[in-house]
């Protein structure tokens, strides 16, 4: 007990002696404590500090998520009021609040979960479909020579400009034919290589034939047009006219027959006769009554 000023019987020496005895008693009690007790007390103090920190972080995260959800809801309401005709946007407020678990760790997102987008980002008019090529990608590496904006290509001009390729094709056909006929080169080739060469030879021959027929048709029609203009200028024809498709076909067939040899005409007539007979037989089989 601390002495008062009125207490005359308690001297200063006695007061100091009492304080020293109390300190000695406290030191004796600390000396008697073990290291295990001190360690457990320290761990308890650290655990309390960690709990306080985790509670503070959780409260901060909750406040942050709640503020974000409120902002997103306000933005979505404003956008819905401004653009009533626009497509609905995905609300990401639920996803943001449920992203964190109770212990504060981030949740693992499922790969089958729907896509989440921010409500602040405006929705595009053209919906982007994953896996589908956009118009930008399709027109990014196109050749301007074949752009439809420049109009249709002039086939006559291109055929005239690249007519020299027919000579290369004919020389290639001749080299393939000699390769197949030659016995030495034929022994070196396998059956698969031989079949590939034969297919290439057949495709080249058919391509040359189609080009020759096309050139012949264009020449026949150009001659007919020239004769019409000449007759109109001379006064033999009143008005030049455009041919129908059926008239064009008849004119081309007549000109082809005139340019053919006798053996070629017979082959063509025989092919047409067989085709007509097969058509008639099919009609007869179809018209027969079923039993």
From Swiss-Prot:
Basic and acidic residues composition bias: residue spans: 125-136, 255-269
Entry's localization field: Nucleus, Nucleolus
Keywords of this entry: Coiled coil, Nucleus, Ribonucleoprotein, Ribosome biogenesis, rRNA processing
Residue ranges of coiled coil: 188-215
BP-aspect Gene Ontology terms: maturation of SSU-rRNA from tricistronic rRNA transcript (SSU-rRNA, 5.8S rRNA, LSU-rRNA)
One GO location term (cellular component): 90S preribosome
Biased composition (Polar residues): 89-101
Record InterPro entries: RRP36
Annotated segments matching region Disordered: 1-138, 174-194, 255-291
Bias type Acidic residues, positions: 67-84
Primary location group: nucleus
Subunit structure: Associates with 90S and pre-40S pre-ribosomal particles.
Family per similarity comment: Belongs to the RRP36 family.
Function: Component of the 90S pre-ribosome involved in the maturation of rRNAs. Required for early cleavages of the pre-RNAs in the 40S ribosomal subunit maturation pathway.
Record-given protein name: rRNA biogenesis protein RRP36
Organism of origin: Scheffersomyces stipitis (strain ATCC 58785 / CBS 6054 / NBRC 10063 / NRRL Y-11545) (Yeast)
Taxonomic lineage: Eukaryota, Fungi, Dikarya, Ascomycota, Saccharomycotina
């Amino acid at each position: 007990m601390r002495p008062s000023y009125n207490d005359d019987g308690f001297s200063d020496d006695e007061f100091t002696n009492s304080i020293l005895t109390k300190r000695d008693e406290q030191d004796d009690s600390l000396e008697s404590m073990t290291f295990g007790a001190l360690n457990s007390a320290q761990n308890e103090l650290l655990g309390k500090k960690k709990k306080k920190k985790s509670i503070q972080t959780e409260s901060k995260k909750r406040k942050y998520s709640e503020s974000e959800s409120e902002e997103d809801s306000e933005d979505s309401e404003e956008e819905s009021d401004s653009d009533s005709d626009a497509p609905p946007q995905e609300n990401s407020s639920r996803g943001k609040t449920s992203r964190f678990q109770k212990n504060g760790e981030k949740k693992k997102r499922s790969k089958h979960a729907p896509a989440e987008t921010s409500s602040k980002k405006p929705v595009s008019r053209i919906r982007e479909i994953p896996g589908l090529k956009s118009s930008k990608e399709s027109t990014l590496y196109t050749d301007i020579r074949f752009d439809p904006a420049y109009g249709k290509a002039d086939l006559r001009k291109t055929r005239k400009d690249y007519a020299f390729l027919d000579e290369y094709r004919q020389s290639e056909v001749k080299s393939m034919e000699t390769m197949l006929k030659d016995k030495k080169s034929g022994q070196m080739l396998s059956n698969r290589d031989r079949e590939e060469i034969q297919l290439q030879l057949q495709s080249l021959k058919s391509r040359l034939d189609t080009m020759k027929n096309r050139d012949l048709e264009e020449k026949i029609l150009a001659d007919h047009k020239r004769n019409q203009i000449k007759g109109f200028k001379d006064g033999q024809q009143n008005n030049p006219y455009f041919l129908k498709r059926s008239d064009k076909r008849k004119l081309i067939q007549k000109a082809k027959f005139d340019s053919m040899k006798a053996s070629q005409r017979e082959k063509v007539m025989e092919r047409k006769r067989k085709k007509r007979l097969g058509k008639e037989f099919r009609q007869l089989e179809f018209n027969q009554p079923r039993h």
